[in-house]
Amino acid sequence: PEPLPYLWLTLEQNLFDKESTGALMWGKGLRFGNRDGFDGGYDIPRVTLLQPTGGSQQLLKLDVYDTVGRIDLPTPVAARGGEVNFEVEYAFDLPPYGSDRMGVEKVEQGTIFQLAQWFPAVCAFDDVHGWNTLPYLGAGEFHTNFGDCEIALTVPRDHIVGATGELLAHLIDKDGQLA
């Protein structure tokens, strides 16, 4: 409905940072808290603007505010059909216990690593309220957009990955890992 000079990202994984609003609200040891001293949250070393013509890529600054982050764009995304492509490099630690759609669980056949929806995504935007930048506090669901994401996973060869979507590539890296 209007040009967008910046984008907001949901960073829900930051709920597990011991200083997040949600972690402080819920306290230690509770469902959304940081059990056993676990201090989570994203490590986001880089956000890159991808040029559609294959030109030089541009690093973008991400300002993080608890469980959301703002990216100021060099050129606004045009209204009514504009498009911007960018890449977010990120990582986060999994707690050594199951916690709200993520965690590590040891079972008789091995270990299950559960990641679910924990990836940065563009916040919902509408022409009535604008950006939905409410912090994620753990309880309840979140308001999201539908869209396409390309996710790259690198896992050891003996791991099984369960996911929705379409497998785009089946590569083996130099260390014999499936990528």
Q: Which sequence ranges carry the predicted segments?
A:
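Extended, low-hydrophobicity, Ser/Thr/Pro/Gly-biased non-transmembrane segments
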Residues: 31-46, 50-52, 61, 72, ...
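Short aromatic-acidic-glycine turn motif
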Residues: 13-23, 159-163, 175
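Short strand-edge motifs at loop-to-beta-strand transitions and within beta-strands
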Residues: 67-71, 82-84
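Short Gly/aromatic-enriched secondary-structure transition segments
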Residues: 5-12, 23-26, 103, 166-172
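Short, flexible loop/turn segments at beta-strand junctions in immunoglobulin-like
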Residues: 73-77
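Ligand-binding face of N-terminal immunoglobulin V-set domains in extracellular IgSF glycoproteins
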Residues: 1-22, 31-33
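Short Pro-Gly-centered flexible turn/kink motifs
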Residues: 78-88
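Extracytoplasmic
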Residues: 2-6, 42, 66-68, 146-148
